[in-house]
Amino acid sequence: MKKQSIFWIIIGLMLFSSCRDKDLDMTVLHKTLFDGAAITEITAEDAWNVTIVQDAEKSFVELEYSAFLEEYLRVVKEGPELKIGFSRYLNLPANTVKNAIVHTASVQKLDFSEAVTALLVGDFPAAMLEMELDDAATCKGGSFGGTAFLKLNDASTMVDFCFNGLFCSLKLDDASVFKGFLTATDSMSIHLEDASRLTTYGGTTPVAIVGVRDSSHLNMVKTTVTNMHINVSAVSEAVVNVSGTLSGTVTGVSKLYYQGNPIINVDCDDLSTIEPLSSSNF
């Protein structure tokens, strides 16, 4: 009898939830906010779909959302920062519409979390960019110069990102993924941890400081580096392209493959390998 009661309670809750979803007003509404306001920092959360368009002529925010979300919208501007999210946690139906399009001349700080999907459109003329992705957020596109500090956490993903500037710092952890083009005329710093993965499509830099650990994988064969210091450890793998000096360590059942004809000064333990890149090992 007790099992039957639990069964009917579960069925009742499922039916109640289904009825509530059917009662939601899914009409798509549109709203324009902050026309002409300067926006240089954007924070988004709660699984919003956010498109950021580089627009030198006008600045505003377009919202497209399901009508039932009206009372929960939390889209505010505090100084130069735009915040996009909801006022409370919502268990949303799969067909819920929650899109934001931000037109702005330049951005200096981006913070995406809680499964936000972001798209960057255009060349952004910021002197410095700080960008962080958390909680399985994803970001695609965008072109930046100057200096950039990028951090990806908690299985976040960044693809088709283009940096062509002075200095770039990139940190990935917790199975995060980066794919993009990197050129830094001064230097770059790249660190991967906890099964993260990085692949570059091209680029150059005179100096690169690289760390790859905890079953992570780095492929920079298409980015030409003059001098690189790299530490590969804890069952990780790195593929690099170095023309000058290659220094560092390879430890803990790890592998380092290199392209080019560098001067090598790398300490390698007995369980790890360092060898030239060839068709047989890549």
PLM feature segments, named:
Residues 1-30:
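Bacterial Sec-dependent N-terminal signal peptides
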Residues 19-132, 140-151, 159-169, 186-189, ...:
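Acidic (Asp/Glu) and glycine-rich low-complexity loops/linkers
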Residues 161, 178-282:
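Short, surface-exposed interaction patches in beta-rich subdomains
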Residues 114, 134-135, 153-154, 173-174, ...:
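Asp/Glu-rich intrinsically disordered low-complexity tracts
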Residues 120, 128, 138-139, 157-158, ...:
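Short stretches within intrinsically disordered, low-complexity N-terminal or propeptide regions
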